[in-house]
């Protein structure tokens, strides 16, 4: 256990984030437990943080003893869509609640889930502010400030917890706040050719965006047999191809690790539970040869 904690504390190793679907509150198999995940995962993101079952809270403590952190997401774009859907069905609400009021209330509601967790991953795509009118940019900046300042206020009051950002840091107007994030998780779900990885990252190399903390997000294959594209780059598994790419040095930015979406899909493998995830980790962080 101590060796495991030391390994996690080592800043040099490539980090592994794992998004886990914890919607099942009466688990019928080991696949539905976060304690079944490979020990060398650094950060587990739970997709459903609001009503944790007792067994989940206990398992978070078990993971913490292994040096694994557990987090959840607050998603700016989802909150915006939620507000727009509400206004489209009940237009009279627009007079009572602006988006900014709705946003602040929703963030505060979701921050209340944070007590058992070690950190929060802010999901933010937003829009490119370069092409906005002065009025639109002012409104966009005000909404952003609410989203980020509310969570930064939370982190300042919760020593030892962390914030990461998943999405597009280049669309953040006030780039000064970006230094507060542990990692930027860059979504590579749409990449279909491993040679296009460097191209996909070019958009992120913008003045003011720290380039020393990039994590690449890809998915495991879907459990739906008819879906042959999710989790694949060409014919190969995306997590494996991405791991190999992460091990190759880049001049302009640091590849700090991988984020695996829907990690639980890799549990049942003929050659052992989480076989592909373990291979991914081993490619990035090979066990020292004896």
Each predicted region: which residue ranges?
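Substrate-binding cleft of secreted/luminal carbohydrate-active enzymes
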Residues: 212-290
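Chitinase-like catalytic core of GlcNAc-active glycosidases
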Residues: 11-202, 211-220, 224-227, 271
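A conserved mid-domain beta-alpha-beta active-site/ligand-binding segment of alpha/beta enzyme cores
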Residues: 205-207
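Generic detector of well-ordered alpha-helical segments enriched in charged/polar residues
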Residues: 5, 100, 104, 275-282
């Amino acid at each position: 256990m101590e060796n495991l904690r030391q390994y996690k504390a080592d800043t040099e190793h490539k980090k592994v984030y794992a998004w886990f679907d914890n919607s099942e509150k009466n688990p019928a198999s080991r696949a539905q437990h976060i304690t079944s995940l490979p020990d060398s995962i650094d950060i587990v993101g739970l997709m459903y943080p609001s009503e944790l079952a007792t067994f989940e809270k206990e398992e978070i403590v078990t993971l913490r003893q292994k040096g694994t952190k557990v987090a959840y997401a607050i998603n700016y774009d989802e909150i915006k869509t939620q507000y727009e859907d509400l206004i489209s069905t009940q237009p009279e609400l627009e007079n009572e609640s602006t988006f900014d009021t709705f946003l602040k209330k929703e963030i505060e509601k979701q921050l209340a889930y944070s007590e058992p967790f070690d950190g929060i991953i802010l999901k933010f795509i937003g829009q490119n502010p370069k092409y906005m009118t002065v009025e639109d940019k002012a409104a966009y900046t005000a909404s952003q400030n609410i989203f980020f300042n509310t969570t930064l206020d939370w982190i300042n009051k919760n020593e030892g917890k962390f914030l990461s950002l998943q999405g597009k840091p280049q669309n953040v107007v006030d780039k000064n706040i970006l230094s507060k994030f542990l990692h930027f998780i860059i979504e590579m779900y749409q990449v279909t050719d491993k040679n296009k990885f460097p191209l996909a990252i070019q958009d992120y190399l913008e003045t003011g965006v720290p380039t020393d903390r990039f994590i690449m997000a890809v998915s495991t294959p879907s459990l739906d047999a008819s879906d042959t594209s999710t989790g694949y780059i060409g014919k190969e598994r995306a997590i494996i191809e991405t791991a190999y790419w992460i091990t190759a040095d880049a001049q302009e930015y640091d590849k700090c690790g991988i984020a695996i979406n829907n990690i639980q899909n890799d549990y049942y493998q003929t050659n052992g539970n989480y076989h592909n995830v373990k291979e991914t980790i081993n490619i990035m962080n090979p066990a020292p040869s004896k």
